[in-house]
Amino acid sequence: MSARCIMVLGTTSGAGKSWLATALCRHYSNQGLKVAPFKAQNMSNNARVVAAPGGEGSEAGGFGAWGEIGSAQYFQALAARAVPDVRMNPLLLKPEADTHSQVVLLGQVSDALSQMPWRGRSEKVWPQIAAALDALRAENDVVVIEGAGSPAEINLHASDIVNMRVARHAQARCLLVTDIDRGGAFAHLYGTWALLPADERALIAGFVLNKFRGDEALLAPAPQMLQDKTGVPVVATIPMQWDHGLPEEDGVFDDRARASGAVHTRIAVVAYPRISNLDEFQPLKNVPGVRLSWARSPADVHGADWIILPGSKATAADLAWLRAQGLDAAIAAHAARGGRVLGVCGGLQMLGEALIDTVGVDGNGPGLGLLPLVTSFEATKTVRPTRQCFGAVQGAWRHLAGVAVQGYEIHHGQTAQHPAMAASGDVARELIPGLAWQNPGGNVLGLYLHGLFEDAAVLRALFGADAPTLDAVFEGLAAGIARHFEPGVLDALAVQ
């Protein structure tokens, strides 16, 4: 088997590559084809735990360990009805500062690559990237490949490992998508095409106009003029979708109000600079009566029923930022009034009394003091899926008692009771051994488990409601591209 490769390129970041790749995965899966997603390199602090080759108990060439990939490829794999694995995103860069990222190669952190200059690193990792793609091609009918940024970044072309080098290696049929809502869409499409070498232009099979608002007839005669200049047709005009139902790949989610009917629960998520795994809160946007918003100042948490401290790629630095904004006092006051506070992973660590770092992973410092816990950072990273059952949860979070939840862990920290405080009887109630605790008052909850709100049982327990399933989201995306692509284009792309 040698898969047909279909690649989604963009004229800019944010053009719509990720959601279109996801829609294509479900569309071709619905045609009865075996489909896998692929993105050579992703830069994101939104990651998921998936199968990785090797590890204790694995067969030769099999999967028995766990690793990380970008969340976008995880969701694309689910859309494709494929088992997510590290080959689908062989290189993941997790930013830790403006000029430094943790490098994850085939699911595992590589300290050597993390210290290596970017241009030198690209050539070193290309063989593993190509091998991962070739393996997926050998096992599937279709591989849907996502590019990154723009393929026409001419200053980066010589060291490219994520756009046209991948397209050439796979001889992929490429769709070039642009965000027409920003303006200048036809210039973006033509300029991107014109900056590519002739052999790479030949791989562009169609242009896609995304996020269109208005009367499509008003676009004429521009699509035909563009085709006359390039030989490439506009194969789809996709209407604006204010909420396609997928988590944002990077940055923060769109927090415009969408609660249907009366709002009964206002949830503020603290948006510190190195936030991670924010995609796990996407289901809350779709729960009836819930209003989800970002908090960057004390005013943003005023009137909130819940405050969530999400994961962080730099816990100590983000905690310092939080204090500089005055959010520490606002969160403490909210908790003192009995308001709910939830800390996930890095957020859990912040809620404790202290951060201790003897290995240079994150940093030392005092915590917020809302849970009598202390976190020690270790060089070894815990990466694994986890299924656990909440114990005797009390107070404001009592509806979680006895609920079994499927999630995942990605953390360097190990958290335990503060020894001195425990000796005096001030202890946190442990709800899941080594993973979840709450304060004696019952309104502050901290846990290492990501994915809490992606579990239907949790949503029912906390809100008495269900959010739309991911499968329904995938089907909606697939139906949308089937309507808006020109007839026959999607079938032709997948033909060998």
From Swiss-Prot:
Keywords, sorted A to Z: Cobalamin biosynthesis, Glutamine amidotransferase
GO MF annotation, one: ABC-type vitamin B12 transporter activity
Pathway membership, UniProt: Cofactor biosynthesis; adenosylcobalamin biosynthesis
CDD domains with a match to the protein in the record: CobQ_N, GATase1_CobQ
Pfam family, one: CbiA
Keyword Protein transport on entry: no
Boundaries of every GATase cobBQ-type domain copy: 264-458
Zinc is among the record's keywords: no
Gene Ontology terms describing biological process: cobalamin biosynthetic process
Catalytic residue positions: 345, 450
UniProt-listed InterPro entries: Class_I_gatase-like (IPR029062), CobQ/CobB/MinD/ParA_Nub-bd_dom (IPR002586), CobQ_GATase1 (IPR033949), CobQ_N (IPR047045), CobQ_synth (IPR004459), GATase_3 (IPR011698), P-loop_NTPase (IPR027417)
Function field: Catalyzes amidations at positions B, D, E, and G on adenosylcobyrinic A,C-diamide. NH(2) groups are provided by glutamine, and one molecule of ATP is hydrogenolyzed for each amidation.
HAMAP family the record matches: CobQ (MF_00028)
Family statement: Belongs to the CobB/CobQ family. CobQ subfamily.
Protein name, entry field: Cobyric acid synthase
Gene: cobQ
